[in-house]
């Protein structure tokens, strides 16, 4: 699809912001839509890193008051120290496994067909989980134990497969391990900060040779679009899950994934293959 680069940047920025914290896989959407728009060259890798960083900052802004309290009290207040400890423990599995398998997964699995398959499988899993008996024992992040954070951390590590969804894995993992919907969603948001920040720094370092001053205007458009779209999505998502299940997201994943697989099978779209 032949669109001006600034339009592609705007589209992908909005897509990233809207999908990063929903259980539908932002990385999967960026891979599929980027492939559809023909924006999948080396520069696009850096662009996607930049717009994901914008989404991190949006969460930091939305939760700035709580994060400021934690930062102010981390040296002396047990509650703040415990909160940071929970995030550190939850971050560890993805950090360790990411360093071990990050490059292999990116080279082998970052393609539309893998994403589509993961979207469908993840959607079916969400439907199955939503039909289980649900009795939360943890109604706030502050009530979590170290073991709860570690288990959610391992769930997050599974989301290294594109199309799985980091937020989906952590939120649904939280539900399985006894967190309320709101507590699971908020811990997922907080856990995204160290996880995505570390991934951003690591990816930028590895792709530093692809950074060029001439790309800054396009990157800026995507950054701003992602930031404001993510701010909206986080607030809307918290309101939504207060009164709804994740079934709508499950069906969205299944339908979207099947459409991509069908267009590939029928040769309607020439998707990039493994």
Curated annotation (Swiss-Prot):
GO molecular function: undecaprenyl-diphosphatase activity
Pfam families: BacA
Transmembrane segments: 4-24, 41-61, 83-103, 108-128, 184-204, 218-238, 246-266
GO BP: any one term: peptidoglycan biosynthetic process
Domain of life: Bacteria
Main location: membrane
EC number(s) given by UniProt: 3.6.1.27
Topology with respect to the bilayer: Multi-pass membrane protein
The keyword Acetylation is assigned to this record: no
Location(s), subcellular: Cell inner membrane
GO cellular component: plasma membrane
Catalytic activity: di-trans,octa-cis-undecaprenyl diphosphate + H2O = di-trans,octa-cis-undecaprenyl phosphate + phosphate + H(+)
Family: Belongs to the UppP family.
Other comment: Bacitracin is thought to be involved in the inhibition of peptidoglycan synthesis by sequestering undecaprenyl diphosphate, thereby reducing the pool of lipid carrier available.
Function: Catalyzes the dephosphorylation of undecaprenyl diphosphate (UPP). Confers resistance to bacitracin.
The protein, known as: Undecaprenyl-diphosphatase
Gene source species: Aromatoleum aromaticum (strain DSM 19018 / LMG 30748 / EbN1) (Azoarcus sp. (strain EbN1))
């Amino acid at each position: 699809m032949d669109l001006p680069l600034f339009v592609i940047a705007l589209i992908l920025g909005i897509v990233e912001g809207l999908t990063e914290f929903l259980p539908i896989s932002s990385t999967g959407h960026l891979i599929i839509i980027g492939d559809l728009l023909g924006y999948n060259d080396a520069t696009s890798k850096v662009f996607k890193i930049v717009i994901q960083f914008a989404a991190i900052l949006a969460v930091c802004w939305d939760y700035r008051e709580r994060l400021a309290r934690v930062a102010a009290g981390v040296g002396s207040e047990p509650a703040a120290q415990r909160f940071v400890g929970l995030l550190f423990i939850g971050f560890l599995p993805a950090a360790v496994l990411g360093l071990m398998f990050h490059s292999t997964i990116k080279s082998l699995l970052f393609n539309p067909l893998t994403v589509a398959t993961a979207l469908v499988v993840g959607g079916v899993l969400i439907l199955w989980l939503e039909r289980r008996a649900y009795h939360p024992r943890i109604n706030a992040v502050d009530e979590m134990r170290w073991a709860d954070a570690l288990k959610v951390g391992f769930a997050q590590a599974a989301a290294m497969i594109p199309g799985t969804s980091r937020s989906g894995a952590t939120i649904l993992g939280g539900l399985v391990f006894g967190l309320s919907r709101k507590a699971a969603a908020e811990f997922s948001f907080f856990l995204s900060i160290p996880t995505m920040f570390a991934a951003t720094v690591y990816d930028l370092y590895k792709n530093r040779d692809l950074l060029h001053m001439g790309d800054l205007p396009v990157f800026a458009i995507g950054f701003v679009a992602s930031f404001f779209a993510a701010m909206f999505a986080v607030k809307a998502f918290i309101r939504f899950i207060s009164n709804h299940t994740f079934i709508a997201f499950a069906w969205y994943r299944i339908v979207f994934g099947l459409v991509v697989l069908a267009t590939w099978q029928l040769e309607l779209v020439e998707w990039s293959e493994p």
